[in-house]
Design a protein with these regions (language model features):
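A short glycine-rich, Lys/Arg-flanked "PGG" loop and its adjoining helix->strand segment in the class I
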Residues: 378-394
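Conserved class I S-adenosyl-L-methionine
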Residues: 61-70
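Surface-exposed cleft-lining segments at the edges of enzyme active sites
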Residues: 364-375
Length: 477
């Protein structure tokens, strides 16, 4: 297909290019308003970024899609701005997070119920320990049980199970999900939460050398395992009951401050004009096969995964998901379906545009398997871009926020290759914006040592914002 840009297209392209050349850093702006701070999530972009494109490129009532919604930033911003928001993700924790962030609650009811949950869980912790320990010994298979025992101290396991048992008794599914997300949020944190991990928000967990619980008891001492290191990491694990109560209270407060209650769809104070809110639609879904009608979406704002699985979301998310009934085996199988995964068996590799194929071939000369992994990534991203082209209305735009990747010492040109693939499918790409990352706020993977050769450290200082425009007219070859 050959895209043909008429006068209307040229005007739209100039507007899109101006947006891409604006300041996209947002370092001096608060990104924790509304429900954006409900739960840690690696590599999420600031809400001001999708808001900028939503406000500039769509009108209230029009449709905004994020087919790889992650923490739901685009979906929430579209909802707040009165657009019809649609979101999909393959990650079950992403669905729970986004659904909770956009679902109004009754704060007094939730606070009262939360206090009951904590009270009953504490009673179970002190007086039903044997029963809960029996539940813990029977509710997982051996592999999952081994994972739990490795990463969670015994008293923490009992406390978490006691809390979760009470959450599961809640009848209202929306309120139950609200509490489940609060439960997950005390595990997946920058400090590793109530687990024995040092850091889960950046997705690369390391177990502590020594841990003390909230009563001052030593719950684990693995210093022999760390004998080769000069400094042994230690951690004080806070009470799961107090952490859970603090988290759900904080999340309720966020809703209360902005008037986001059941049957009360008031506009937030920081918007100039009130608009009608449209209930968002979010579900589990694969961006390579978007369950949306053709030519029905006005704008897409999304952030695709890094190539070669550089940010492994499941590595951290499984710490919570195992408590919700998933086994390690199920999550491992599920992880292989992610775009950017490193599996090379039974994958469909597309013929790609020349510069993209050249990039793949140069990497293959250094490392054949990594070359196949990169070919898989670009093939899957071609599927994604093809689907986005299908669902966008003529004159619609897709905005990609992507990071670059350096594999085996080679820059694999993510923004350039994705632009080339998009152009081959019929998109017009007027420009690529650059935004400098505030690494502490973007929550990128960290390292305990400085390694100048690390591919993580080499590439994660900036990211790219690509604008894909679907022209009003396409000419067949």
């Amino acid at each position: 297909m050959i895209p043909v840009a008429d006068v209307t297209d040229q005007t739209a392209l100039k507007k899109l290019n101006r947006l891409l050349t604006d300041d996209l850093d947002f370092h001096d702006q608060d990104s924790r308003y509304a429900s954006h701070s409900f739960h840690a999530f690696p590599a999420k972009f600031p809400p001001q970024l999708p808001a900028k494109f939503i406000q500039s490129l769509t009108n209230p009532g029009e449709t905004v899609l994020d087919p790889m919604m992650g923490s739901g930033t685009t979906v929430l911003e579209a909802f707040l701005l009165g657009r019809e928001a649609i979101g999909f993700d393959i990650d079950p924790l992403a669905l729970l997070l986004t659904k909770t962030k956009i679902t109004p609650i009754h704060p007094h009811q939730v606070m009262a119920l939360g206090r009951e949950i904590v009270h009953r869980a504490k009673v179970s912790f002190h007086y039903r320990r044997d029963e809960i320990e029996h539940e813990l010994s029977t509710c997982w298979d051996e592999e999952t049980k081994e994972f739990i025992n490795y990463w969670f101290a015994k008293d923490v396991q009992i406390a978490l199970k006691a809390i979760l048992n009470e959450i599961e008794k809640v009848d209202d599914e929306d309120i139950k999900d609200f509490f489940k997300l609060s439960f997950s949020a005390i595990i997946i944190t920058k400090s590793g939460g109530v687990s024995l991990a040092l850091d889960l928000a950046h997705t690369r967990p390391h177990r502590v050398g020594r841990a003390v619980d909230w009563n001052g008891n030593v719950v684990c001492d693995f210093r022999r395992e760390h004998a080769h290191t000069k400094r042994v990491s230690s951690k004080k694990i806070r009470s799961p009951f107090e952490e859970f109560e603090h988290r759900y209270t904080q999340n309720v407060r966020a809703f209360r401050e902005i008037g986001f209650f059941t049957d009360q769809m008031n506009m937030f104070e920081y918007f100039d004009k009130p608009v009608s809110r449209l209930k968002p639609y979010v579900a589990i879904g694969n961006a390579q096969c978007i369950p949306v009608n053709s030519s029905s979406v006005d704008l897409i704002v999304t952030s695709p995964p890094y190539a070669s699985n550089a940010i492994d979301y499941m590595r951290a998310h499984k710490f919570s998901l195992v408590w919700f009934g998933y086994t390690i085996a199920e999550l491992t199988t599920h992880r292989r379906k992610y775009i950017g995964a490193e599996g090379t068996r039974d994958v469909l590799l597309h013929n790609l545009p020349p510069n993209t194929m050249d990039t793949i071939e140069r990497l293959s000369l250094k490392d054949r398997k990594k070359g196949i992994v990169l070919h898989r990534y670009y093939s899957e991203m071609k599927n994604v871009l093809s689907e986005m082209f299908r669902v966008l209305k003529p004159g619609g735009t897709a905005v990609f926020v992507v990071g670059n990747s350096n594999i085996r010492g080679q820059d694999v040109s993510i923004p350039e290759c994705l632009s080339e693939i998009g152009t081959s499918l019929g998109f017009l790409v007027p420009g690529i914006g650059i935004r400098r990352l505030d690494r502490n706020r973007r929550m990128m993977p960290t390292s305990t040592t400085v390694n100048n050769e690390s591919q993580i450290q080499q590439r994660m200082h900036e990211e790219y914002v690509i604008g894909f425009y679907k022209p009003l007219r396409i000419q067949d070859l």
